[in-house]
């Protein structure tokens, strides 16, 4: 299977290290072989090392170094936020963030729900075994 996530202008990437960790950005220019100029609607345009970026499958159609308003229009037209939220990678990050925000009582309630669900599964399995025998 060929590699499909190339560093290119318009590629949506996820910052995986630093103060902007977890933020979706768009590559607007390639500075050199180790750095790119990235931009997002809610941040300043800044250079970032490729090692701090995780490339996604999402790509928007923009020119090199667009104005902020053009970038925002392109992001909205491509519906990047919704596509990211629907992707398995995006959903995993959302689940991870919500689990990290749980307090002790929430974790306790989840534990009780899991126990209750497992008991229900066990009862149904016992019924099926009884009817099969």
UniProtKB/Swiss-Prot annotation:
Belongs to the eukaryotic ribosomal protein eL14 family. The keyword Ribonucleoprotein applies. InterPro entries: Rib_uL2_dom2 (IPR014722), Ribosomal_eL14 (IPR039660), Ribosomal_eL14_dom (IPR002784), Translation_prot_SH3-like_sf (IPR008991). SUPFAM superfamilies: Translation proteins SH3-like domain (SSF50104). It comes from Pisum sativum. Keywords: Ribonucleoprotein, Ribosomal protein. GO terms for cellular component: cytosolic large ribosomal subunit. One of its GO terms (molecular function) is structural constituent of ribosome. This is Large ribosomal subunit protein eL14. It comes from the Eukaryota. Disulfide bonds: none annotated. The keyword Ribosomal protein applies. One of its GO terms (biological process) is ribosomal large subunit biogenesis.
